[in-house]
Amino acid sequence: MIIYVDIDGTICTITDGQYSDAVPLPSRIEKINKLYDEGNKIVYWTARGSQTGIDWREITKKQLNEWGAKHHELSLNKPHYDLYVDDKTINSYDYFKD
């Protein structure tokens, strides 16, 4: 299975564009790492820089590595939007409920 996972507000805190200040959410990272360990392809997908044009790739890669977030790919091409409607989405709050 190929699983796309958002970063901000999903595996770390939301920082309103101050991405260097993001704090990891370890229990959420562990849950995604389990999916990785089970053989799923994990792609972290973020809209960092989509409005400003700033390239956050290196900082984001460093954060994922420091946080121990296992993944196969990092994609920074997620568009900025206010609402996402899709037949395959899962709300992160529902997904990470214990």
Regions picked out by a protein language model, each given a short descriptive name:
Residues 1-98:
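Catalytic phosphate/metal-binding cores of nucleic-acid and nucleotide-processing enzymes, i.e., regions
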